[in-house]
Each structure stands twice: as structure tokens, then as C-alpha cells.
Amino acid sequence: MNLEVKKIDTANSHLSAKPSIEDLKKRYDKIAQKIAQKVKIDGFRRGKVPLSLVKTRYQAQIEQDAQEEMFQEILKNALKELGIESKDLIGSPNLTKFEKKDTHFEIEADIGLKPTIVLDKIKECVPSVEVEAVDEEKVNERLKQLAKDYAKFIDTDAQRKAQNDDKLTIDFEGFIDNVPFEGGKTQNFSLILGSKQMLEDFEKALLGMQAGEEKEFSLTFPSDYHAKHLAGKEALFKVKLHQIQAREVLEINDELAKIVLANEENAALELLKERVKGQLFLENKVRLYNEELKEKLIENLDEKILFDLPKTIIEQEMDLLFRNALYSMQAEEVKSLQENQEKAKEKRESFRNDATKSVKITFIIDALAKEEKIGVHDNEVFQTLYYEALMTGQNPENLIEQYRRNNMLAAVKMAMIEDRVLTYFLDKNLSKEQQEILEKMRPNAQKTQVS
């Protein structure tokens, strides 16, 4: 066999081979015998099917298996010549040429290797971190909100007129052109006036009503209303108000602290203020990281940490980005790409820079996670998806199964690891005082969130 290998850089090698057709044919009998042991053909006992019949019926499979076996042998010899162990391979080799000639095959393939990454410049990559300080005014605002959120609603006298922040119990039905519309009728519906739970004009129409009162009013749905069949249309609503309850706002004192921090011993107002201040700091930190610093850190990692990337993995990522783009294209654009291969190649090529950066950052994050022993347990992935399902009104089990079926669980896990790695290094650049706030918050993270 004529085999040539070339090491392009630390992450890429190339092989060229010209195995003879005879070499391929020598493999036919052995492969046919394996197939004969497994298949069942009418008129023959299992394992007793004539080899000639197996070769005829399974010719395509035998040819394919023989080619795969031959290529694996070529790859094994190529790795041996290059001094590379199979554990250092990453992904599958990219077969760039496989042509059958009169007496031989012409085969070429790119081989991707796990990159060598030196992380000595990581400190240079982490931007300075200045999280906005939490002042007393912000703490007091949050305390007022907590006093409101934990307040109870109490019954009012029959003469009270509905006002903002009251809790109403109502029946209502909506009509368009005097015909009830789908989803427009509800009984014993609870609504806090001014909460924007319903359309603003709907809530305004209820102001001043009294318990037992009935009212009719018209409003126009916004043109961008989520229910398309109602968008921009005028509707008549008939409403009956059953009950008005007023919010009994709690005082900001130790009693409020005991309610909010119900699971903590010795809960008092000063402890609540400390928890609130810490929570506000965390919110400021997360917002700064997500809106600015994580992306800045990624850009610095991309710019300063240099190493060879396996071309095979970049090509796979380009394929993925191209396929994902096709899903969001109009049918006409997809058809245009199908009919014009050159245009399709250009479109795929347009993803090269994004694919290269994505692959590079993934390798860096993986290396940093291993060095710092940062990981994500499978249960944490499921918890994240469970929370996503609750927030979007989906069935958690169905959502998790959907991710599993589409092989997306690994991507979710990698995204969570990336977030933890970036947060870990940004937290290192916090001031000493802010790091102390973080340390105080961590033991209480699973207890109470005062937000």
C-alpha cells in the first residue's frame, strides 16, 4: 500500500493512500462469513447460508464494510507513522477524497488532534470588575417591596370603591361583533388592579366599581397582541365584581424579618437588611457579567490564548451553524440554495469565522474547567430545564425528553459549565470587600432569596 502522511501543525495531520482493489476484495470473504452467521434466509438454517448467496444479496453492505475496514487499517498505519495515539484523535477523520481507479483507490483524509493549550495568560484576559455598590436607598426600596409582597389581603366594607393595588374577584366575558370570542370568558378571576395582569384599559375600567356591581365597556386590543385573532379588534366586555380586598401592608420591623426569613434562627431586621443588601449586590453582579464582562472575557481569551485548532472540528461546526441557519430561512431562500451549489457553499463558508471562534472558546473553557475542577452534575442540568419548563408553561418531563431526543443535553451542560468558568474568573477580580459579601451569601443561597 502506498501511504503518505504529513503533520501540518500540532492539531492537524493529513494522509494520502493508494490501496489496491485486490486488497479490498481480499476482505470480502471474511465480511461475508460474518454476515452469513447473523442473517436468516428462507430455506436455510442460520449460519448455513451459502457464501455465494450472501455475496449476491448483501453486495452493497459487503463493499461498504470492506471499505470501512480498509480505511481503519490505513488510519491505524498513518497514526503509527505520525507517532500519534488513537486517544489523541478528536472527532472522525474528514475523508476529502475516495476515488476508485482501475487498479486502486485514491484516498485522502484530514485528521484532527486534541489541541495543546497553554493557559499562562489567563490572568491577562480577565477584565477589571467594578460592581455597582448597593446604597441604603436601594435597600429601603427592596424592604418596602418585601413588606408589600408579604402583605395579606383583607376584606373591605361594601361601600369601598376599587382602587389600584386592591385585589378583585370578578366574572367577565368578552364579545367581538356581539359574538363571544375564544378564551374571553372567566369566572371568579383574581386580579390585582394596577398589576398589568390584564390590558391597561381593562384594569382602568374597573377603577371605582363596588362589590356586586356589573359593568359593560369597550376596548381595542393592541395591534401586536399575542393572540393574533384578537389583535387590533374592538371588543365589548361584561364584568361583574364579586369582592374587593385591600392589601394590609406590613411594617418594616423584626416581625417582617421573621416572616421573610422564616427558615432562619434569630431573624431580625438587621439580618434582613444584610440579606437584602447581599441579594441586590448579586443582582448587580449578574447583570454586569451577563451584559458586559462575560463577553469581554471571551473576546480576550480568543485574542490572547493562541493554539492550533483541528480543522475537522471547525468544519463540523460550520455544518451545524449552516443547518441551524436553514431552519430560520424562508422557503424561497432554502430552495435557491438547493438549486445553486456554489451559492450554498458561499453561505456555508460565511460561518467559518463564527465556527472557528466557537470551537476555540469551547476548547479553552473545557481546559479551564478541568484545571479548576469546575463541573456540572446531570441533576443540575435537569433542574435547569425543569425551571425553564415552569417559566414557559411547559411540561418539564416533555421538555427534558425533547432535549434528550435531539441530543441537546450535552450542549446545555456545556453552556452551564461555560457560565461557571467565566463567573469563577470574574469573581476573582472582585474587590476584597465584595468577595466577602459573596462569601456571606453562599451559605444562605439555598435558604432564602429576598427578592
Swiss-Prot record:
Pfam families registered for this protein in UniProt: FKBP_C, Trigger_C, Trigger_N
Subcellular location, principal: cytoplasm
One annotated Gene Ontology cellular component of this protein: cytoplasm
Compartment(s) where it occurs, according to its Swiss-Prot or TrEMBL record: Cytoplasm
One of the GO biological process terms: cell division
SUPFAM superfamilies assigned: FKBP-like, Triger factor/SurA peptide-binding domain-like, Trigger factor ribosome-binding domain
Reaction equations catalysed: [protein]-peptidylproline (omega=180) = [protein]-peptidylproline (omega=0)
Function: Involved in protein export. Acts as a chaperone by maintaining the newly synthesized protein in an open conformation. Functions as a peptidyl-prolyl cis-trans isomerase.
Annotated domain remarks: Consists of 3 domains; the N-terminus binds the ribosome, the middle domain has PPIase activity, while the C-terminus has intrinsic chaperone activity on its own.
Entry protein name: Trigger factor
Native organism: Helicobacter acinonychis (strain Sheeba)
Species classification: Bacteria, Pseudomonadati, Campylobacterota, Epsilonproteobacteria, Campylobacterales
